[in-house]
Amino acid sequence: MRAVLTWRDKAEQCIYDLAFKPDGTQLILAAGNRLLVYDTSDGTLLQPLKGHKDTVYCVAYAKDGKRFASGSADKSIIIWTSKLEGILKYTHNDSIQCVSYNPVTHQLASCSSSDFGLWSPEQKSVSKHKSSSKITCCSWTNDGQYLALGMANGIISIRNKNGEEKVKIERPGGSLSPIWSICWNPSREEHNDILAVADWGQKLSFYQLSGKQIGKDRPLNFDPCCISYFTKGEYILVGGSDKQVSLFTKDGVRLGTVGEQNSWVWTCRVKPDSNYVVVGCQDGTISFYQLIFSTVHGLYKDRYAYRDSMTDVIVQHLITEQKVRIKCRELVKKIAIYKNRLAIQLPEKILIYELYSEDSTDMHYRVKEKIVKKFECNLLVVCADHIILCQEKRLQCLSFSGVKEREWQMESLIRYIKVIGGPAGREGLLVGLKNGQILKIFVDNLFAIVLLKQATAVRCLDMSASRNKLAVVDENDTCLVYDIHTKELLFQEPNANSVAWNTQCEDMLCFSGGGYLNIKASTFPVHQQKLQGFVVGYNGSKIFCLHVFSMSAVEVPQSAPMYQYLDRKMFKEAYQIACLGVTDADWRELAMEALEGLEFETARKAFTRVQDLRYLELISSIEERKKRGETNNDLFLADVFSYQGKFHEAAKLYKRSGHENLALDMYTDLCMFEYAKDFLGSGDPKETKMLITKQADWARNINEPKAAVEMYISAGEHAKAIEISGSHGWVDMLIDIARKLDKAEREPLLMCACYFKKLDSPGYAAETYLKIGDLKSLVQLYVDTKRWDEAFALGEKHPEFKDDVYVPYAQWLAENDRFEEAQKAFHKAGRQGEAVRVLEQLTHNAVVESRFNDAAYYYWMLSMQCLDMAQDPAQKDAMLDKFHHFQHLAELYHGYQTIHRYTEEPFSFDLPETLFNISKFLLHSLTKATPLGISKVNTLFTLAKQSKALGAYKLARHAYDKLRGLQIPARIQKSIELGTLTIRSKPFHDSEELVPLCYRCSTNNPLLNNLGNVCINCRQPFIFSASSYEVLHLVEFYLEEGITDEEAVALIDLEAPRHKREGKWRETSSNNSQTLKLDETMDSIGEDDPFTAKLSFEQGSSEFVPVVVNRSVLRSMSRRDVLIKRWPPPLQWQYFRSLLPDASITMCPSCFQMFHSEDYELLVLQHACCPYCRRRIDDTGP
């Protein structure tokens, strides 16, 4: 139960009493010395009524709605009409305390401090009766025969309608417990009149008309000021000094709070025949609430448990319609039912019940366990040995002793949970979340299994009987059905609020919505019928439907889905549907359709249902013939048609199956001689060719194709024989003809090959093409039938067909989303333009989808493709420009992948130094236009954070300043603003440990280099590691003019000895890498190294002076110190000299990217390939 505030108003004086007009449209309030009339629909003050001279204490409306009365401290009573006009006024000797109209005679009882009076419209005077104490409250019984008076001395006086006392009830406590409010239960279903009494001894009690107390006093723990029943008497409202209105059952069990106020509640009433409650307070507040009583229930198969009267639980057997009531005498908060278990959550405990016996119809429950703990949960589920509590995003699994065994934390709010069965203690749960995620949880497993994730929130779930399909109703009222194994959305239907699978049929489900019940079988259209309520279960032909608070079992005929299956010739499925419940006529229709579809097993079962022995005998005979080896289905169907009286259809099938004699016998037996003569043969096949041809024409005209074919062959008319055989699909006859023909007869052989292709016999077609030597047609055949291996083999033997094979193959690969293979196939076919176009599209898609590693790889492949195309002199310059451009983009995207992962994903495993190096590399590389997909914001944000973390405060401040000029996403806006402020507190310089060193001139370069990734002193370009992006200790050098690459390698390989110390470099070369490593006794490069002299340059020059070496320098170099990028022509090889002896560098022989050896080995172990060009370690060539 929850209370929703509809409207609220504030009067200037205390609200002592109020009354509803019986039709509920108006509300009369006693506020100060006036009456206030409100419209209950929106809280509009209609009119204030003046007439009293002092505070109005009470007001009451007559049951017929014609009059209402008010009593005041000015000792007067005013009678008002429903038109808000005062018509009568009379007085007492003291202030008026309460008034009440007789519900039958409309007699008015008015009570003061010393007496009470009875007035009716028929009498002119008011009969008054003295009272021994101050009367505080009064109430008439339902039949209007008795009036109960509550007094300040703790006595309740029950009088007849003439004022004579009949019963006197003395409350314990006497005058210390004044009676402050009383009310008779208005229910007509109660056997006795029941009076509810609230006194200032802070007790709530109940009495019969005889004065006998019902049950014990109920403690309230506050001074009650008002008590009021609901219209049907099922609930009680009590308000008072606790500044709130409490809801009780008619037995006095507290259920909850309607509304908390800021002052004492002096009066509260229920709007007639509704769940609206109005509250009047000491401070003049009027609050109008709507009470919403939610349905608390649980369902498992044919057992349905629901809450009744808020404190009882009723278990209903939906098949037998038996019901059993379990009285809890406390507020029932949650109910869960599963097999023989029933769990009921009360405010301070959970009760677990079990059935007495294993009988499926047993309805006797007994308490199995009690968990005496208070739990707060949204959903409750019971299993064989556990209780599952759902709290927002968390699930807790408790044993029946209350011990928490397991807990699951979800990503989003849990919207739906259902037990889907399983062994005791290992049951499975189906859980639907608000974020659209659907999980399966086993109570003995800590890890949830994600079944699928959809975009919309889950409202309802159900799993099919075999657990292969999942039906989901989302917040858009759409029913979606998924294949659990493939996650594929099978179909979806609109206007659904609940869904249930048939427990006896895998492919049937029903869902409700929009006032209709929808039944869907497989993927067929929905069958609808009108039905109000929510579908909660589907068992066989019964659908369990919940409407408001009532659960009912609806019998639904299964004819419609059965005929849907029959239309698709799905006979076995149609039989399964029929077993759920159809008529005899439906069974016969199913049997006939199955028999015509040659589904004899289904037909036999269906005919058995309708006990048709004649057709059962036919089915038995056909099955016996099939056991003997007969396989001609047309012949079987012809027999079926003849049994059904469809003689002409039977004759056609006999003819089609080659058993014209059976048709002849059939027509003869039926004395249908006119039809029988159509099956008579004529002519002698041994006559002349002309006669045979005419006979063949006649046979063809009378639909005797086989005979016609044989005759045409005998007559040498092969073309006509092939035409007839091909049109009838006789492949065996066609291949016989083709094999008998000479290879010189090209036209008929080509006709045979054409028919073979049409009849899906590519092997025979290939044999025919080979026979006539038509290799081009054979290649086309292989391509059309996707027999690529044969096509490739033929292309290798005959290169002139290579283009005819690889181009269609590449197009087929592209159509099947195998783009990388398609690109290679285009390349192999010499279609460079298509190959490049495929790569460009792949690259663009990778960038758009933020797959930057793939983008880098595709750009590298593009560059190598362009380098290959640059061998054409006409395209050399353009292709080399593209090569360098794509190489540059590949390096950018390769580095940016790490930045993207760091900024977009919740966790990053990259070192701060790596992130710092990459972002600095990108910053210096993005001096011009920024490529698509690369975010300067992310790059600068990463650089700023890592610079600050590593002590490069000056660079961090520069990055934050740059960010101020860019459009920042909202998710990192606060982080950047905070970083911009905090960086100001740091010193304005960078850590010396981070400053990059030029290995040529030993100059310390600033972190922010206006020249980009080159030395500011000597302009020597930096060589970066492709993994950590640290500056490598390499210097590129160039060969003196006249020295070829082969001569240079030969000079380097001479390895002239060094006299100072032994050279200790060790080189490891393989197909996968070229590695320099240092032996333990390695000495640094001496000052007498000729290469060192070549590193010098002219100071102060702004031009880059490359290092150029001659033969003597090359001869002095050790092969172990040199790395060579052996680019294919027209590019020149690139040479690099290692200047530090204490670090090992590895270069990939395919993409020529440099790595620290340890990094490269780790990355190759992780990916089994080069991280840059994806060259696998088991590849033998570069």
Curated annotation (Swiss-Prot):
It comes from the Eukaryota. GO terms for biological process: camera-type eye morphogenesis; cilium assembly; dorsal/ventral pattern formation; embryonic body morphogenesis; embryonic camera-type eye morphogenesis; embryonic digit morphogenesis; embryonic forelimb morphogenesis; embryonic heart tube development. SMART domains: WD40. It is found in: Cell projection, Cilium; Cytoplasm, Cytoskeleton, Cilium basal body. WD repeats lie at residues 10-50, 51-91, 93-129, 131-169, 174-217, 219-258, 260-300, 453-492. Keywords: Cell projection, Cilium, Cilium biogenesis/degradation, Cytoplasm, Cytoskeleton, Developmental protein, Repeat, WD repeat. InterPro entries: Beta-prop_IFT122_1st, Beta-prop_IFT122_2nd, Ift122/121, WD40/YVTN_repeat-like_dom_sf, WD40_repeat_dom_sf, WD40_rpt, Zn_ribbon_IFT122. Pfam families: Beta-prop_IFT122_1st, Beta-prop_IFT122_2nd, TPR_IFT122, Zn_ribbon_IFT122, Zn_ribbon_IFT122_C. As a component of the IFT complex A (IFT-A), a complex required for retrograde ciliary transport and entry into cilia of G protein-coupled receptors (GPCRs), it is required in ciliogenesis and ciliary protein trafficking. Involved in cilia formation during neuronal patterning. Acts as a negative regulator of Shh signaling. Required to recruit TULP3 to primary cilia. This is Intraflagellar transport protein 122 homolog.
